[in-house]
């Protein structure tokens, strides 16, 4: 890997229309980006955040190596969301597709448009479980904790049910 090649983790989520189809379309579109060696986690089914009255989500994590700068990757992810019908009406509301950059190498970014690592990742089993599945050696760039510990901590603190793995 060259110094311009950055390992990234991207979370996908959908709970409107045909969520499995939206995840597939998002993966297909991500494959067209400068995102090499792309791997996909299992698909998980999770309850909406904060017990909101909306359909359950399907979630998945993808990882790969990119040459894009973090802001460029964010713009590409937002363009994919828009093409797939994402409408931003309500925070944590239902959506056709949600695409979040979880990590960008071991970098930390805190800009008005992008926060990396994703600031809510440690509270979300639907991110932690697939991250452990496809990158079991991953280490949080701020805390230094491995993904295994982050997931153990979530399990010990959260009263939310674990997401259900739908497909390997």
Regions found by a protein language model. Give the residues of each.
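Short hydrophobic/aromatic beta-strand micro-patches
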Residues: 11, 63-65, 104
